[in-house]
């Protein structure tokens, strides 16, 4: 069973937090980190994040041509945006549903379908993420950037589906509960022989460090 290449793209504080305890929607990284994200998603066919992340941000990051920190041009070519979860509480007024992108939904609850939402395609979660991702590959999706949140990252980790990690370490101690890999069932993740090699790294101007990891041994079996 073949799946797309899964690339986790995140910014994390030194203490492993994805967002601030109070203002979850605020980006914890700098403008330099935004350029890292911009470059990462320009190289994939699709991005995926969970319904909880969409509820917090109500939009997705679009590929841009940056002129400076405040001026940019949104590029015409954008990856497909895939949302995973229950769409029942989504609001069609959110910016996301008016952004110039193709929107796909992986519905975790087929009984709860909001037909008013502007999704181009709808899929259903099938038994495991491996099987669900295999269905996406059949649709021509070869590379997916996994953008969060923690629950979805955890689900992918539990099935050992992540092939690469692009992480920016932000020089801040934030605290709070929003860690990028939940403690729940963490010991099962450590049972995997997860060894990673550094493909590249870069110290950014803002004392942030970007590291690109890839699996040392691809344990994913195709059958």
Spans of features found by a protein language model:
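Enzymes that bind and transform nitrogen-containing heteroaromatic metabolites
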Residues: 1-223
């Amino acid at each position: 069973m073949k799946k797309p290449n899964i690339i986790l793209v995140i910014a994390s504080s030194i203490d492993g937090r994805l967002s601030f305890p109070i203002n979850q929607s605020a980006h914890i990284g700098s403008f330099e980190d935004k350029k890292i994200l911009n470059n990462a998603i320009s190289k994939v066919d699709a991005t995926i994040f969970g319904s909880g992340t969409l509820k917090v941000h109500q939009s997705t990051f679009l590929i841009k041509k940056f002129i400076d920190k405040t001026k940019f041009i949104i590029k015409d070519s954008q990856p497909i945006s895939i949302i995973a979860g229950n769409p029942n509480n989504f609001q069609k007024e959110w910016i996301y549903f008016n952004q110039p992108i193709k929107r796909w939904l992986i519905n975790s609850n087929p009984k709860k379908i909001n037909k008013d939402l502007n999704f181009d395609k709808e899929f259903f979660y099938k038994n495991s993420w491996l099987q669900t991702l295999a269905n996406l590959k059949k649709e021509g999706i070869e590379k997916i950037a996994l953008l969060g949140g923690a629950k979805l990252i955890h689900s992918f980790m539990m099935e050992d589906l992540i092939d690469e990690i692009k992480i920016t370490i932000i020089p801040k101690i934030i605290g709070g509960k929003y860690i990028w890999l939940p403690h729940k069932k963490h010991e099962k993740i450590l049972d995997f022989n997860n060894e990673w090699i550094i493909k590249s790294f870069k110290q950014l101007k803002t004392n942030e460090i970007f590291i690109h990891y890839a699996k040392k041994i691809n344990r994913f079996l195709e059958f």
